From Swiss-Prot:
One of its GO terms (molecular function) is NADH dehydrogenase (ubiquinone) activity. This is NADH-ubiquinone oxidoreductase chain 4L. It is found in: Mitochondrion membrane. It comes from the Eukaryota. It comes from Yarrowia lipolytica (strain CLIB 122 / E 150) (Yeast). Belongs to the complex I subunit 4L family. Its EC number is 7.1.1.2. One of its GO terms (biological process) is ATP synthesis coupled electron transport. Complex I is composed of 37 different subunits. InterPro entries: NADH_UbQ_OxRdtase_chain4L/K, NUOK/Mnh_C1-like. Core subunit of the mitochondrial membrane respiratory chain NADH dehydrogenase (Complex I) that is believed to belong to the minimal assembly required for catalysis. Complex I functions in the transfer of electrons from NADH to the respiratory chain. The immediate electron acceptor for the enzyme is believed to be ubiquinone.
Amino acid sequence: MFIGTIILVLSFLGFVFNRRNIILAFICLETMLLGINLILLRNSVLFDDISGSLFAIVIIILAGVESAIGLSLLVSYYRLRGVINSYGI
């Protein structure tokens, strides 16, 4: 019924329980943003407001930029140190 809320809660739990692996933490953060976007889009359609849809598009763009920058930083850190778990940092 409320798929956005379910995705948001499950990804938050995944983030809390998988804090050791940074890649999984990034994936959980991205799915949290997906859940927030689904909630925004649902409320935008429900209240017949276009600003929620526009804000969801902005969040999708920023999430793509954030994941590209984060992944490139992880690749550089892995090349430098050889480990990418959170205890190695």
